[in-house]
Structure formats: C-alpha cells, structure tokens
Amino acid sequence: MTNMPIIQTILASLAFAFSNWKKLIEVSVFPLLMALPLVTILPEMMGVLQAQLFGVGQVQAYPKFYQLYLLMFDYGYIAILINIYRLVVSGGASVARLGVVLPSIRLGRFFVLFLLLSIATQLPLFFISPLLIPLVYFLLIPFALNLVSIANDIPYKKIKLPARVQLSVFLIKLGVPSFLVALVILIGAQFVFWVAMIIIIYWMSISFALCYRVIVANNSAQNL
C-alpha cells in the first residue's frame, strides 16, 4: 500500500457515524455507566487539583473512592474503544448488547498495549518537550493499529507502513480533533468543550478503525 485516501476516509468515517448512530449509542451504554461516577465528582476533583497545583482556593481532600472511580472510568474508556473497533471492523453482531465488555484475555491484552502506548506518548511531557508528543504519536501508529487487531481477536503482528500512509493515518485521526480543539478555545464555552470531547473520542475511534480496514484490505489484495 502506497497511499491512504484522506478525504475519502474522512467522508467514510462521517458516513459510518451517521448511518450507525443508533448502534453507537447502544454500545456506549455500559462504558458511560462505568465513567459516570468519575464525571459526577469531576468538578470537585478539579477544585482540589487547582488548589494543589496553582494555589487557587482552599486545599481540600480528594473525594471518597476517587481512585476506584478513576479505574472505572479507564475501564469504560477502553470498553468504548473495543466496542467501536469491533463495530467498524467486524459489524454490529460482534458487539455485546449495551456494549458490555467483561474481563477477558482480549481485554487484558488490549489494556497492556494501551497502557504501554499511553506511557510512551507521555514520556516527552516529563523528560524532553511536550512539542515532541505528536512526533512520538506518529511513530507509534503501526503499534497502535494492533489495538484494533486485538479488539477483533486478531493475533498481534508488526504492521509496516510507508511513511506517506503513516502520515495520512496521523492526519485523519488527529486532524479533525485538532480543529475542534482550536474551535473550542475560540468559543470558550464549557458545554461546547464537553461536546467536543465526546465527538473527538468517537471520531478518533471510528476513523482509526476504518484506516485499519483499508490497510488490511490493501495488504491482503497485494498478497494475492
């Protein structure tokens, strides 16, 4: 594969979202329930963090069970990724009702790779420069594509991509979110911020899974 059609993939991602919106809502029920406890205490946690880091307001203790709520939120986030990756690649029949994701080998493998990728992308923030985060993210795209493989019970394998294709995947997945973030900064409304965050989560998941489908389909055709 030598080229990834950016415009066509963006349009395909939008078409998928609009044509499968009911299923997307259904597979989000369980992840949303897992994330809800943290969402309810988020304003209180933000107040504590602002007091500790920036000296804004009075320093208070963290809410009760916040660590448990953080774990539940992470579980919910991973669950929505797995559900969307399966929905895009394998179809609606491959996703459990209401998007329930139970502990399994698949979930464990997904979590381990997800954790390693998350740590790798955040390393520049602590040791070098935050400006290098996009570069690290770009370099890790072939490994990140295996998250889609694992979600669909496909064995892990090294995915080799030409630099041009890798750049296209990077732009497709992060181009729209970057535009939305810039728009939110200009508007500055809190409600718009949360709507944009939800859109970004779904966009990145759907577009990335579609990129995976295109790459796998082209590689299979070339091997015939």
Question: Each predicted region: which residue ranges?
Answer:
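Detector for methionine-enriched segments
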Residues: M1-M4, M34, M45-M46, M72, ...
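Interfacial aromatic "cap" segments that immediately flank transmembrane helices
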Residues: T2-M34, L98-L123, F138-I185, L224
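A diffuse structural propensity rather than consistent per-protein peaks
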Residues: P5, Q60, S94-A96
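Short, small/hydrophobic-residue-rich motifs at membrane-helix boundaries and re-entrant hairpins
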Residues: K23-G91, S178
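Juxtamembrane "helix-exit" motif on the non-cytosolic side of transmembrane helices
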Residues: P43-L53, Q122-S129, L183-F191
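Selective recognition of hydrophobic, aromatic-rich stretches within alpha-helical transmembrane segments
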Residues: Q60-G92, Q122-I154, A189-N219
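Short, Lys/Arg-enriched, Gly/Pro-containing loop segments at transmembrane-helix junctions
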Residues: V95, N219-L224
